[in-house]
Swiss-Prot record:
It comes from the Bacteria. Component of a cohesin-like complex composed of ScpA, ScpB and the Smc homodimer, in which ScpA and ScpB bind to the head domain of Smc. The presence of the three proteins is required for the association of the complex with DNA. Keywords: Cell cycle, Cell division, Chromosome partition, Cytoplasm. Participates in chromosomal partition during cell division. May act via the formation of a condensin-like complex containing Smc and ScpB that pull DNA away from mid-cell into both cell halves. It comes from Lactiplantibacillus plantarum (strain ATCC BAA-793 / NCIMB 8826 / WCFS1). Signal peptide: none annotated. One of its GO terms (biological process) is chromosome segregation. This is Segregation and condensation protein A. GO terms for cellular component: cytoplasm. Its main location: cytoplasm. Belongs to the ScpA family. It holds the Pfam family SMC_ScpA. It is found in: Cytoplasm.
Amino acid sequence: MTNNQQQPITIKISEFEGPLDLLLHLIRQNKMDIYDIPIAAITQQYLDYLHSMRALKLDIAGDYLVMAATLMTIKSRFLLPQPEPDEMDEDNEDDDPRDSLVAELLAYKVYQEAAGELREKEQARHQHFTREAMLVPADLSAPKLTAGITLDDLQAAFRQLVAKRRRVRPLTKTVVAETINIDERMTQITTQLQHQPQGLDFADLFTVSASDEMLVTTFMAVLELTKQDQVALQQAEPLSPIHLYLRQDEQHDEH
């Protein structure tokens, strides 16, 4: 006699923290170039994963479905007839539908790097005896980005850098190990700003030859310096270059 009751399925799908985590896993597993993602292949593999989840009657979080729609949209743009070079507008000449996705993936790597560093610091703290934590003052405000500059503005600037990096990077390059962490990069940036009191453009912190690790470490360092009020950001208008300055009190502290 057949037992009609379904047995509960035990499967570890929580290996991935979200759609970007899954995409990064697929890119690494297939040794794909994050700056030149074969969109048809990655879309098919991503959809195959979702189909397998459905086959096992597992719930799929909404953000996974949103990413699936995004991948399909990018794929469809590649299937459309492309304009001839002489018919392209200057503004769209270097537009690649993957740019925004690549920037999101690299930004996600930023948070992975930061989470890894926090875990290491937490483990190191467990090796020491510490006094009881003091209560946080009620009037202590959460760190914010400079007034007028939002996280979206920084991410937009980051996407522009990714697009430029993809266009101008060499086809082959010698890989040089860079082991700098976020704290060290923060020190480098503040030192650079001490020698440039007039400030510098956000884009000038990112060299074309830098590794992906340096790219995300630099981005995270800028976020941290801004949140700590060591660095001020200015932007004349939306999507215009973001300028960094060392705050006056920080400059005086160094003299």
